[in-house]
Amino acid sequence: MAATGVLPFIRGVDLSGNDFKGGNFPEHVKSMTSLRWLKLNRTGLCYLPEELASLQKLEHLSVSHNSLTTLHGELSSLPNLRAVVARANNLKNSGVPDDIFQLDDLSVLDLSHNQLTEIPRDLENSRNMLVLNLSHNSIDNIPNQLFINLTDLLYLDLSDNNLDSLPPQMRRLVHLQTLILNNNPLMHAQLRQLPVMVSLQTLHLRNTQRTQNNMPTSLEGLSNLTDVDLSCNDLTRVPECLYSLVNLKRLNLSSNQISELSLCIDQWTKLETLNLSRNQLTSLPSAICKLSKLKKLYVNSNKIDFDGLPSGVGKLSNLVEFMAANNNLELVPEGLCRCGKLKKLVLNKNRLVTLPEAIHFLTELEVLDVRENPNLVMPPKPVDRTAEWYNIDFSLQNQLRLAGASPATVAAAGGGNSPRDHMARKMRLRRCKDSAHDDQAKQVLKGMSDVAQEKNKSIEENGDLKYSDLKTKRWDKNLEKPQLDYSEFFLEDVGQIPGVSVWQIENFIPIQVDEAFHGKFYEADCYIILKTFLDENGALNWQIFYWIGQDATLDKKAGAAIHAVNLRNYLGAECRTIREEMGDESEEFTVVFDHEISYIEGGTASGFYTVEDTQYPTRLYRVYGKKNIRLESVPLKASSLDPQFVFLLDTGLEIYVWRGGNATLGGTTKARLFAEKINKNERKSKAEITTLMQNQEPPEFWEVLGGQPEEIKKHVPDDFTPIRPKLYKVGLGLGYLELPQINYKLSVEHKDKLKLDVVPELRLVQGLLDTKGVYILDCWSDVFIWIGRKSPRLVRAAALKLGQEVCGMLHRPKHAVVIRNLEGTECQVFKSKFKNWDDVLKVDYTRNAESVKQEAGLSGKVKKDVEQKDQMKADLTALFLPRQPAMPLTEAEQMMEEWNEDLDGMEGFVLEGKKFARLPEEEFGHFHTQDCYVFLCRYWVPVEYEDDKEKGKEKGEEGDDEEKQPEEDFQCVVYFWQGREASNMGWLTFTFSLQKKFESLFPGKLEVVRMTQQQENLKFLSHFKRKFIIHKGKRKLKVDSVQPSLYHIRTNGSALCTRTIQIATDSSNLNSEFCFILKVPFESTDNQGIVYTWVGRAADPDEAKLAEEIMNTMFDDTYSKQVINEGEEPENFFWVGIGSQKTYDEDAEYMKYARLFRCSNEKGYFAVSEKCSDFCQDDLADDDIMLLDNGKEVYMWVGTQTSQVEIKLSLKACQVYIQHMRSKDTENPRKLRLVRKGNEPHCFTRCFHAWSAFKTAPA
């Protein structure tokens, strides 16, 4: 394999993450004779493999995070070895060989996170050492001779050891740039060596027992020092030596005892990060405002108050992060809000009362943390001046126009809504007083008039204007070029730099060719060549050629010609596109490539479709995962099945989803959906998908798997964890290949910056794949090759060969295959390896009308049509309709009488247990919140008689007496009523029992109407003649008879909608405009209690009379009954029974204004609809926004399942409604209030009859 493969050309490979325990190291590594770097991190190695001896050109070796106990082996035989990284192993002193320090080129050594107790022997002989990392060991002493020869060191890390002192020879490290000594005692170190290290850039002395006495007196010579860390020490003030570091950029003084800062800090003019957290500071000096380059300032856990922050903090114009948590701040200076680049502001655990209003103008602010400030009141947000949200014009004029208002109304709404701009008026007055502007304007007018006079004079002298003055543009100049988007084919900087660019036509699309392959043309391909140069005037000019190969297909020829013209239009060039054919190139063309043109046999495939039968390989996959399923290929045999899992058998046009006996239903459903995606995206919906249960498989299923087994046994361990996929990026250079591995936990190659929650389990994301690259994804059981659309052809070819080598090199199952994926046509199994790879089209709902206008490149009427088509639809008509007027009492009584005249009979039933029992007539009109009722109503249907005169013409008078009159018809309506606290089992019981019986008794004449509490049919309510009573609990459930009960009588918009509902027994629920019934029971057999009908002083007299009748209906003579007016309540029974006297509402003005609107997107667009005046608490939809107008406030009620889009659109609709009502009802201006479900105030709940707790779903 190695002789004919690509292994000898590989210069670097990253095999980290593979399992090389127990001698599984691949032997083919010996064939990589050109290997320069090799990474074997996290591979489980216990010793260095022997194959390393064959890698004589190896320069960099990384074996971190393994179980190595020794580095003895062939390292000393590698003459070119430069770097050895063996961090996080089990190395001891004896495990580090002495002979590796005799290597002349060894310059990097990392032995950190091991078990060393002393410096490796002979380390001082490595004279060319540049980087030395011995941190996180147990070294307690550094020999004096170590740094005698290591004078070229650039990086030294000795942190997290047990060092007490430092050798004086460290002053020889004059080239050292980074020195890290964190977490060492260093109690005897005075750091006198520091001033000599003139090249030092980074100095970390965290937790090294630094005090004022053991710091150097001066560091003036360290002009390059930019990063200093002195945190977790015992400093009481800033060391004086730090003030001389004029180039300091990062300074960490956190976790010390510093109580004040000197004014000398203004010398740190280049400081970008300052950390003073966890000290004893009470204030910051004003000199800190002179640090104009400061980007990050941390002062957490100090004692700073408002006076401790300088007012000039706004001068820190580059400040990005400011953290002052756990201090004593009551306010923050308004100048802080002038730091326009501020992105993170943390002020939690303070004593904040409010924040400056300018906080809302920090447009780049991403994090504002003000938690644990109990008295904080956020300043109001400024009014948004933009009328258009989500491409919807929410201006009052536009919405009135859409609602069909008259032009006068629309104009009035616009005229009365524009507030005076006093600032603009001042500016106008100032401009009027400024005579300089007037003089300038007069000069401009005089100049224009002089030019016009000279032109007229020349016409009079010379007659008509010359022809050249009236010369028109050429016909082709007047043509309007279409606004086409070429950015998908050509980059932005194309043609902007002198040079040559070449594109190859592939699948109708131009793909840019690397500069190394310029002048090399495939005989079956076509190319576009652009030469950019500067003309004699220094302006950019271009030459555009398109080259045709002798064996090129028609689609490539056409594509080259078309895209050459597209390139000319994209550049705005005026040159011609020149056709060049293979073997007949012009001299002008060959000069572009210095007469060095070569032809290569072959070419890419044609872009035209070829009709051939697709061959699908048969694969068997095991499905695992909970939230997002993933597939792992397993051997194609019946023994691979396991009853714990779901398996997917893909035979091409037959896809089987097999569910094991112990597999979950959710996993089966997701596997079925996955199969549907395969069918739709890869099989053109031609495959048949079959779901199979264990022990119910058809014979053809077992034929594919080689026969049915005797028993399907569990063989996958319970702690099964899939092998982590490894993503490689193929690199190609001049004569070599590289295969680096992408660490997608720490990768910075994403198109968007990754957040921590994006890859919580080291998951791959689609953003890692670059369209210009080629990648290999090694999933152990499968190897995928992903080819980007703009990747070079040679890299593609090398990746295909390299994928085969990788597949055969490492130990993997026999059924593993290499699968090729082109960008945009990836298979579903490949996509499942990535997190949230979804091909759903992204829609931007935040576009406004201006952005829509900019997108349309049309003009005139066509442009307007495009804008109207792109605008999002919204219906706010309901907000501008008048409130539904209350129905007069006489009209309601007449309607009630008519409906009752048609009623022939009514039978009632109530659900008792699991059956419906007949309801006694004396209980008609009494309902309970936990019960379900059924009422069978029989109505007479009027019959239309024929005209007597027409009858007389057809029949004689004698026949009229004998003629039979037609029988009157009837109709049956079944009303099903369900209480708020009743379960849906009542409806199911009715559907399968009583309804079937009624349908058999009245075939074709039965209508079923389902109703819930307080959402009843008006016709149904009319049968109870305003005596509709709703009790709490169940009908036959014996409640505590000693507890008083209170009933509220209320009419909503019509006398038909009158209900008497039991509410909480609390005097705060009383209202002077309503009537209430209070039952106070006694513990006596003779007298069961006393019942009061309480009549408010402003109650309607008709309702007061009705309340007395309802009281007599509800209670028999065993109760004492009494009608009392407000203010005449007896103390003994009434106030004691109702639970003491409390304040209550004395008016119900809200009943005259109350309106409830629903804002929803359920129609596919944003629409507002109004509920009828008889609304109730259950009309509050949890997934929508509700607007409640009570005449003074407009409440915006937000449910728990409401989308953010609905919230934002509803807010704008609410503002439009308030603006409209301000002009319609000037005496009652509304205020906007926000209410979240479960936190409704009393002014909101009183608009609903009998408000109580929300219904909850059964557990």
Swiss-Prot record:
Keywords assigned by UniProt, alphabetized: Actin-binding, Activator, Cell junction, Cytoplasm, Cytoskeleton, Leucine-rich repeat, Nucleus, Repeat, Transcription, Transcription regulation
GO BP annotation list: actin filament severing; actin polymerization or depolymerization; barbed-end actin filament capping; myofibril assembly; sarcomere organization
Disulphide bonds in the chain: none
SUPFAM superfamilies: Actin depolymerizing proteins, C-terminal, gelsolin-like domain of Sec23/24, L domain-like
GO cellular component: actin cytoskeleton; centrosome; cytoplasm; focal adhesion; nucleus
Role of this protein: Is a regulator of actin polymerization, required for proper myofibril organization and the assembly of cardiomyocyte cell adhesion complexes. Is a regulator of the length of sarcomeric thin filaments. Regulates cytoskeletal rearrangements involved in cytokinesis and cell migration, by inhibiting Rac1-dependent paxillin phosphorylation. May play a role as coactivator in transcriptional activation by hormone-activated nuclear receptors (NR) and acts in cooperation with NCOA2 and CARM1. Involved in estrogen hormone signaling.
Gelsolin-like repeats mapped onto the chain: 509-589, 628-702, 757-830, 1170-1225
LRR repeats: 7-32, 33-55, 56-78, 80-103, 104-126, 128-149, 150-173, 176-201, 222-245, 247-268, 269-291, 293-316, 317-339, 340-363, 365-385
Tissue specificity: Expressed in ventricular cardiomyocytes, where it particularly localizes to intercalated disks and costamere-like structures (at protein level).
GO molecular function terms listed in the Swiss-Prot or TrEMBL record: actin filament binding; phosphatidylinositol-4,5-bisphosphate binding
Name this polypeptide is given: Protein flightless-1 homolog
The keyword Calcium is assigned to this record: no
